[in-house]
């Protein structure tokens, strides 16, 4: 029973990280953009 109560309180505990979780799907797009910027910097060799 205590484990169930602990699991019920987990979403409240992690509510602080919700902005980070909202941004996470966009992170691979930043890496893709970084690859293009890097290739533009080296002249697309």
UniProtKB/Swiss-Prot annotation:
Which GO terms of the cellular component aspect does the record hold?
A: photosystem II reaction center; plasma membrane-derived thylakoid membrane
Which Pfam families is this protein grouped with? PsbK
Mark the transmembrane ranges.
24-44
Coiled-coil positions are none
Which keywords are on file for this protein? Answer: Membrane, Photosynthesis, Photosystem II, Reaction center, Thylakoid, Transmembrane, Transmembrane helix
**The keyword Transmembrane is assigned to this record:** yes
Paired cysteines (S-S): none
SUPFAM superfamilies, alphabetically?
A: Photosystem II reaction center protein K, PsbK
Query: Lipid biosynthesis: is it a keyword of this entry?
Result: no
Q: How does it sit in the membrane?
A: Single-pass membrane protein
Q: Where in the cell is it found?
A: Cellular thylakoid membrane
Gene Ontology terms describing biological process: photosynthesis
Q: Propeptide positions in this record? A: 1-8
Query: Which family is this sequence assigned to?
Result: Belongs to the PsbK family.
Assembly and interactions?
PSII is composed of 1 copy each of membrane proteins PsbA, PsbB, PsbC, PsbD, PsbE, PsbF, PsbH, PsbI, PsbJ, PsbK, PsbL, PsbM, PsbT, PsbX, PsbY, PsbZ, Psb30/Ycf12, peripheral proteins PsbO, CyanoQ (PsbQ), PsbU, PsbV and a large number of cofactors. It forms dimeric complexes.
User: What does this chain do?
Assistant: One of the components of the core complex of photosystem II (PSII). PSII is a light-driven water:plastoquinone oxidoreductase that uses light energy to abstract electrons from H(2)O, generating O(2) and a proton gradient subsequently used for ATP formation. It consists of a core antenna complex that captures photons, and an electron transfer chain that converts photonic excitation into a charge separation.
According to UniProt, the name of this protein is Photosystem II reaction center protein K
| Native organism | Acaryochloris marina (strain MBIC 11017)
**Which gene specifies this protein's sequence?**
psbK
């Amino acid at each position: 029973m205590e484990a169930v109560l602990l699991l019920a309180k987990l979403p409240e505990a992690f509510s602080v990280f919700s902005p980070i979780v909202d941004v996470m799907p966009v992170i691979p797009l930043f890496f893709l953009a970084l690859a293009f910027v890097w290739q533009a910097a080296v002249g697309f060799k």
